[in-house]
Amino acid sequence: MNLALHSRAKRGFRLVAIASGVLVSGCLQSTAPQPSVIQLNGTWKYTGVQTQPVRETLTGTLTITRESGASFQGRLDLVTTNEQSGQITNIGGLISGSESNGNLIDFDADLETVRRHVGQIVADTITGTWIGTASNVNISSGTFRVERQTQ
């Protein structure tokens, strides 16, 4: 009886070891970079307008440096010009986003505040709107257009 119990315990241990190996393997594979399905890597010319709370023109560069599946990461650097006062400000920060439905681009730009951009991609141009909020509940919003720069 002791031998039968030992044999069952050994078999149970093997099954647990195999199951654990499969689970760990599955987890490891899911975090590996996947082939890009969107092909956004590179430099994009950014133009836009902030319509609230104060009207500003926005110009700069969106650089996509990493893609995995439908996700992407990079950096946005902008020069903002207040249309009333003429004051110029440089802002920049990291971005992360994703593509869905074949042509919808959605990304957050961590500038002075987080600005969520949602736009449609057609060929080498993305156009859309953005909205940002600060801790003091001020809401900023506007439109944007980015065009791929040729290498």
What do the PLM-derived regions correspond to, one by one?
Residues 98-125, 130, 134:
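Acidic, glycine-rich flexible loop segments
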Residues 36-58, 76, 126-132:
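Tryptophan-anchored aromatic micro-motifs
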Residues 23-26:
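C-terminal motif of bacterial Sec signal peptides marking the signal peptidase cleavage site
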Residues 53-55, 112-114, 137-139:
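Glycine-centered tight beta-turn/hairpin loop motif at sheet-sheet or coil-to-beta transitions
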Residues 79-81, 133-136:
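Short glycine/acidic-enriched loop and turn motifs that connect beta-strands
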Residues 2-16:
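Bacterial N-terminal signal peptides that target proteins for export
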Residues 29-45, 64-69, 120-123, 149-151:
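N-terminal helix-cap/turn-to-beta initiation motif at the start of protein domains
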Residues 55-98:
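N-terminal glycine/threonine-rich, aromatic-flanked beta-hairpin/loop signature
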